[in-house]
Amino acid sequence: MAITKYKAAAVTSEPGWFDLEGGVRKTIDFINEAGQAGCKFVAFPEVWIPGYPYWMWKVTYLQSLPMLKRYRENSMAVDSEEMRRIRRAARDNQIFVSLGFSEIDHATLYLSQVLIGPDGAVINHRRKIKPTHVEKLVYGDGAGDTFMSVSETEIGRVGQLNCWENMNPFLKSLNVSAGEQVHVAAWPVYPGKERQVYPDPATNYADPASDLVTPEYAIETGTWTLAPFQRLSVEGLKINTPEGVEPETDPSVYNGHARIYRPDGSLVVKPEKDFDGLLFVDIDLNECHLTKVLADFAGHYMRPDLIRLLVDTRRKELITEADPNGSIATYSTRQRLGLDKPLEKKEGEDTPDVL
């Protein structure tokens, strides 16, 4: 049965830098906390596990190599016990979870998101379609069958996008066309405008993401929009600085950027710079009616006879296989990664994975 009114949460916290196990434990802690607070939904930032590698914007190639190796070693596969523990936590708390993580698949990393249901099933698995600028040195592109965002659930039509995908007009159009009602605008960690240095444009700083891009997404799509954001501490600055380089000493410019917006773009909540934890919101899906009755860009307020978007969701692989009948074998990335397999409790597990 559809749930139209419920409590949700957005995470604004410091990740477990370069620490897969620590990141999984912290993720489960937040899922437990959200569940105990009565939430039906909790949203995590972009590549929450094992943290966003902001150092890639500031280091040389040689400086990056030890950090990149460690980052890859602590990225997470979707068909892994770490992911299954997170899925079990969602099931134990009967909660929907939007999780951003650095996914390792064979030898390539992806800026990935999953939407996990209250039964522990992975409802949606997606990858950022195009890493941003220097991110291309760390991550690969999403494919045709890994970029769809919106899922039909009992808490509404829930969508997820990473970072600057949230200002991509084509992806917004695609999400609107799916009737999105609740959106996760997942952001990484990067500094506020206090750190802007000419000629770097303001686009590349956190304030426009929090206070322009995210509310614009809400008002253009008429959706409840949760914007989880990572944070940094003095210790985090040290961990994310290569050996031989003097670390920054003031993490405050990286903090306080998470937001939650109503479907009309008005602000629900923003944290103080020293806040670390969950931001809460009481969602009422029926509020979307009055925003979408004014502007539904997938329905009464669009002209598909004049403007249309072509979307290709076919999987493309380097190798095309023939099946036993001589036809082309077809399977999805989801199937290849084992996401269609049912989630089972680990042997001897009788209690929730509360850490």
From Swiss-Prot:
Its EC number is 4.2.1.66. GO terms for biological process: cyanide catabolic process. GO terms for molecular function: cyanide hydratase activity; nitrilase activity. Coiled coil: none annotated. The keyword Zinc does not apply. It comes from the Eukaryota. Optimum pH is 6-7. Active fom pH 6 to pH 8.5. It catalyses: formamide = hydrogen cyanide + H2O. InterPro entries: C-N_Hydrolase, C-N_Hydrolase_sf, CN_hydrolase, Nitrilase/CN_hydratase_CS, Nitrilases_CHs. Induction: By cyanide. Gene3D superfamilies: Carbon-nitrogen hydrolase (3.60.110.10). The keyword Transferase does not apply. Keywords: Hydrolase, Lyase. It is an enzyme of class 4 (lyase). The active site is at E46 (proton acceptor), K128, C163 (nucleophile). Residues 6-285 form the CN hydrolase domain. Pfam families: CN_hydrolase (PF00795). PANTHER family: CYANIDE HYDRATASE, NITRILASE. Belongs to the carbon-nitrogen hydrolase superfamily. Nitrilase family. Oligomer of dimers, forming left-handed helical fibers. Catalyzes the hydration of cyanide to formamide. Degradation of cyanide may be important for plant pathogenic fungi in infection of cyanogenic plants. This is Cyanide hydratase.
